[in-house]
Design a protein with these regions (language model features):
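A general structural-boundary detector
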Residues: 20, 145-148, 182, 207, ...
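Active-site proximal loops enriched in glycine and acidic residues that flank catalytic Cys/His/Asp
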Residues: 173, 208-210, 232
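Glycine- and aromatic-enriched membrane alpha-helices
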Residues: 239, 243-244
Length: 288
């Protein structure tokens, strides 16, 4: 069932585990993630970037597909449909389309402007029963054209945004979107600890979950991270499985060219990746 992310993240924070946000790009992605969450009895957040939303012909199409698929597959675990790294305008489009959760990424604005826009969107979202995530300190790498260098957020600025009543807070702690470079310095647990001390029970969000070592993930969860975003890793798994299918010539065997057969190995690879992450994050069996 589609719900806001508020309750699942409160439970994750209290239970010292994290809920995975897995970004969707099409029907196969969505189906694979939903089925895995149901199989493992885990809450899940479906992330949609503005670029992916545009690719799928608009947020209205995405919301309709997810709601219908959730119903037709008989999904009973909590599912939040969440805008990832939303612009100010994108947030309003997703609210209108029927998303249950939004993220406003105002990290590229001067702090006061980020604060003003975040305040407005928190009030709008909560009046509609939606959850909202805001960001302080840009996350490294590139996300739909927004480039961040992996900076660390100011804990005092994090507290100011948290005090607005956001449901989850994304704070830069040296994390990066996409593949991590060989010279990456790792997560700044000192920064995370300081942010946790300032924000208390606020669920914290770790973006760029792909490629972070398992021990760092577990330590981040112990320091208050309750939501971890995964996108690139599913894309790499999908691409690798699809490549092997083609290179083995299976598309030339019988009706192996049928998209339902051609895309099946990739879909299975996404399921395996999502399962691995849910087990690592500790969310298996936590759906209520």
């Amino acid at each position: 069932m589609l719900v806001s992310a508020t309750e699942m993240l409160k439970k994750a924070k209290a239970g010292h585990y994290a809920v995975g946000q897995f970004n969707i790009n099409n029907l196969e992605w969505t189906k694979s993630i939903l089925l895995t969450a149901q199989e493992l009895n885990s809450p899940v957040i479906l992330g949609v970037s503005e670029g992916a939303g545009k690719y799928m012909t608009g947020f209205g199409t995405v919301a309709a597909m997810v709601k219908a698929m959730d119903k037709e597959l008989g999904i009973t675990v909590p599912v939040a449909l969440h805008l990832d790294h939303g612009t100010y305008e994108g947030c309003y489009k997703c609210i209108k389309a029927g998303f249950t959760s939004i993220m406003f990424d105002g990290s590229h604005y001067p702090f006061e402007e980020n604060l003003a826009k975040s305040t407005e969107l928190v009030n709008v979202a909560h009046n509609l029963g939606l959850s909202i995530e805001c960001e302080v300190g840009s996350i490294g790498g590139e996300e739909d054209g927004v480039v961040g260098m992996g900076e660390c957020a100011d804990p005092d600025e994090c507290k100011t945004i948290a005090d607005l009543g956001v449901d989850m807070l994304a704070a830069g702690i040296g994390n990066i979107h996409g593949k991590y470079p060989a010279n990456w310095q790792g997560l700044s647990f000192e920064t995370l600890d300081a942010i946790q001390a300032k924000t208390g029970v606020m669920p914290l969000v770790l973006h760029g979950g792909t490629g972070i070592p398992a021990d760092m993930i577990k330590k981040a969860i112990s320091l208050g991270v309750s939501k971890i975003n995964v996108n690139t890793e599913c894309q790499l798994s999908f691409a690798d499985a699809t490549r092997k299918y083609i290179e083995a010539g299976k598309d030339l065997e019988g009706k192996g060219f049928d998209p339902r057969k051609l895309l099946a190995p990739g879909a299975d690879a996404i399921k395996a990746t999502v399962k691995e992450k849910m087990e690592l994050f500790g969310s298996v069996g936590k759906a209520e």
